[in-house]
């Protein structure tokens, strides 16, 4: 029975740990990448970058029901970020259709600060994007599916000095959907049923 209980716990743990995610990401001017649930109560910092000409690469495991969060901060001039992602649910990219955003009321980019903003909610759809190789940034993640995006304006007007409403603070972008699906109840039922059959066969063999 101890072995069966161990197998059951192992099966549940495997279902909860949904799989590997790889992210190639950059932002003008800097970013912090998190994963966690929709409420932001278990955010994990996965990486950060502070040089927009550089595409940063990250690889990590996500849990079932996890979303990805990009906290991005501009320091003046044009503003945007770009990403190509491989997740358990498939390929994801930076574009205005796959993400939502909120603007922080302060400049606290600590994990606690980001979590507080996520908990406050108020998500909206981002408005601004341009092609992956657009000026002044060029193709940093080298994938034509990855747009340069921002929540209100890319800041390309007025000599690349069009202000954003998040100037002086920062914006948080979250995937529309979880990047690792939560297993259906039937999946757990099938796992338990299969293990129960193994237990019954084991008992029958022992009795024989």
PLM feature segments, named:
Residues 21-30:
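Short N-terminal segments immediately surrounding and downstream of signal-peptide cleavage
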Residues 26, 63, 69-180:
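Accessory carbohydrate-binding/adhesion or oligomerization-edge regions at the termini
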Residues 30-84, 115:
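Beta-strand-rich ligand-recognition modules
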Residues 5-20, 176-195, 201:
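Short, threonine-centered small-residue motifs that mark membrane-proximal processing/anchoring sites
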